[in-house]
Amino acid sequence: MTYGSETIYYQVLYAPRKTMQIAVHPDGTVVIKAPVGTKSEEIETRVHKRAGWIKKHLDYFRQFHPRTPVRRYVGGETHLYLGRQYRLKISIGERGEVKLIRGYFQVKVKETNSSDKVKRLLEAWYAEKATKRFKESFERCWPAFEKLALPRPRLKIRRMKTRWGSLSTRGTLTLNTDLIRAPRECIDYVITHELCHLQCPDHGPRFYCLLEKVMPDWEKRKHNLELALV
């Protein structure tokens, strides 16, 4: 939909509800929740009427982008882990290592001005923690789907540019390593979202009914994820 010089893209979710709702999220996504059976023309009319309000909120959220500044990997800089900020403490050591001690990322390198080395060490630490924490999160989320007699997917972890997670047709659940920066509840949300695709490949009404059933507070978790990592 075009409003002035801007094109507004929106996603429609059909759900068992009586009224239509429009929401603008911090990441710039516009979501329309409509009662099952609502005609597309009716949705378009509502969006056109609310176009000014939608653009106002999109502009509001844009002022905060990018939320995370470019990282320099120097002492005193803050980095996220499981939703909390920790400062870097860099010191000289015989071998490179990263430890999380008393609210600090304590990084040892052979040269204090080696920001590239600090970055590599921290990313390797994140990858190691992601492997462990994501497996724990998966085990928390899986029982709800095991009851549905669905095939257990294989878990894969790697860095992804544009997605937090995905589920392949071959049954591989891939999670973005960077998700380790988010709170545990948000990691659980991403995993649960992808697991719902085992039964519902698209984002139709059945998908959201299942998501609502296994995780009633999924919208709050999604919102918190957007606030933390957008």
Where are these regions (language model features)?
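Active-site-proximal or metal-binding-adjacent scaffold patches in catalytic folds
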Residues: 1-189, 198-230
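Walker B catalytic acidic pair
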Residues: 194
